[in-house]
Every structure is written in structure tokens, then in C-alpha cells.
Amino acid sequence: MLPRTLLGLALTAATGLCASLQQVTNWGSNPTNIRMYTYVPDKLATKPAIIVALHGCGGTAPSWYSGTRLPSYADQYGFILIYPGTPNMSNCWGVNDPASLTHGAGGDSLGIVAMVNYTIAKYNADASRVYVMGTSSGGMMTNVMAATYPEVFEAGAAYSGVAHACFAGAASATPFSPNQTCARGLQHTPEEWGNFVRNSYPGYTGRRPRMQIYHGLADNLVYPRCAMEALKQWSNVLGVEFSRNVSGVPSQAYTQIVYGDGSKLVGYMGAGVGHVAPTNEQVMLKFFGLIN
């Protein structure tokens, strides 16, 4: 089997594709000096969907671009990928920042929304099909984006993250922070967690993003309890109750945790899976409605 890099070069040569990750400047409001990269496939769909992909602590936008198979799916299905990057706080997202946790107040979240708006305008993208995903700190920020800007995102997928506002009030949100209460499984009632979401955008009564939560049961950096707390939060916000567990889905090591009929909220907990849970592009993109 050809290594992935060689296979990609072979496919590029065969098809004449030349799309690549590109840095974008001057996209709009950027209160925390974050960076924007995009991957726009050569064969762009009419009114393309957008996925915002958020890297983990210590990562970068280019490293996360290389970290999943999303670019190859973008080539096949014609959607756009936005890769934000943060140079702040050991390259960790500001999930503790009151501005990021509040609709329209600033922080990383406002800069990311500005990237989305820029991309929609530039490529005539479909504003009703904007999605967000991320790993570790990016998974935490995925929950923040879905909670703080629900009108922007149709659905999200958080890998190895924590509930929205779990790090609220902490001095920082890195693996080196002295306060690791959140990452060790801070607990609230579903209603308390739900109120953190509702209070991030007071008065909002519109639809809320559908969510997937992925986590490893052997994660000793961001404890598995964090995923269960995130599921409690979104079950309250989305108004769906736990319905069943399904063993061996999407693969043998995992248990699928289904809420309601599974169309709004699903969790995946992996036995023997550490930090971070691997990205399952196919399951995620099916949930988003971007592939069959």
C-alpha cells in the first residue's frame, strides 16, 4: 500500500487537482489575533457546506489539516474546510475566556464566526450547512461554538473535549494549568449545564446545533466523565432523553450512547482509547448529513 503522502501525490497527478491549504488574512473581526486557513477543493459544490475544524492544545491549523481525512472527503463532496489556529495559551483555545463564552462579546469564538461569515460571502456557501468539529482543546471549543453561536452552526462533533463553560473562571485552559477541576470531570446537573449554554446567548429561542460527543475511556488527561457531563448538557439543551446504549458501534471498542432517536445527540465511548479519540470522518459526516 502506498503511504498516504505518496498516494495523495499520485491522485493529484492523475486528476490534475491542485487545491491546497491556504492562509487567509483580513477576514474580519479578530480580537485575539488568531489565524485562518482554508481548504477549498477544486470541484466546489453549488452552495457548498462548511466545516470548521479546530486543533488541539499545542497544535496548529496546518497540523490539523494533515491530521484527518477531511480534505479527501472535501475533494469528493465539494465542501469547504476552515482551519482556525491560535498562537495563544500554548496554542490552546480560550474556552475559559468570558468573552468567548458570551455571544457577540469577543474572544476566539467571535473571530471564528467572522471566518465563517467571510467564507460564506466569498464562496456563496450555504449558511444553513455550517458545522464545527475539533479534538481535545478543539473539542472543548467545538462545544463553546455550538453553545455561544447556535444560529451559525447546524451540528457539531467534539472529540475528547469538555462541556461548554466547564473551564469558566479558570485562569487558563491548558494541560499545564494548576486548576484541572474541569478536565478531571467537573459535575453539574443537566439543568445547570444547560443554563450555562442558555446564558451564553440570553433571549435566544432559535434552533440549537445537533451534537456528537466522542471520548476514550482510557483518557487520563481529559477524564471520560467529561464526555458524560457534555452529554448531560446537550440532552438538557436539546430536550432529548437517554434512550439506549449500542455495543460495537461504530467499531468493536466503542459503545454508542443514543439520546431520543439519535438524530440530535449521540455519544461514542471507546474502551482502551486514550487521549485523543481518533476522528471518525465517515460517522461524523453522515451525522452532519454531508454523505450518505
From Swiss-Prot:
GO terms for molecular function: feruloyl esterase activity. It catalyses: feruloyl-polysaccharide + H2O = ferulate + polysaccharide. Residues 1-18 form the signal peptide. It is an enzyme of class 3 (hydrolase). Coiled coil: none annotated. Glycans are attached at N88, N117, N179, N245. Keywords: Carbohydrate metabolism, Glycoprotein, Hydrolase, Polysaccharide degradation, Secreted, Serine esterase, Signal, Xylan degradation. It is found in: Secreted. Its EC number is 3.1.1.73. Its main location: secreted. One of its GO terms (biological process) is cell wall macromolecule catabolic process. One of its GO terms (cellular component) is extracellular region. It comes from the Eukaryota. Belongs to the carbohydrate esterase 1 (CE1) family. Feruloyl esterase type B subfamily. PANTHER family: FERULOYL ESTERASE B (PTHR43037:SF3), UNNAMED PRODUCT-RELATED (PTHR43037). Involved in degradation of plant cell walls. Hydrolyzes of the feruloyl-arabinose ester bond in arabinoxylans as well as the feruloyl-galactose and feruloyl-arabinose ester bonds in pectin. This is Feruloyl esterase B. It comes from Neurospora crassa (strain ATCC 24698 / 74-OR23-1A / CBS 708.71 / DSM 1257 / FGSC 987).
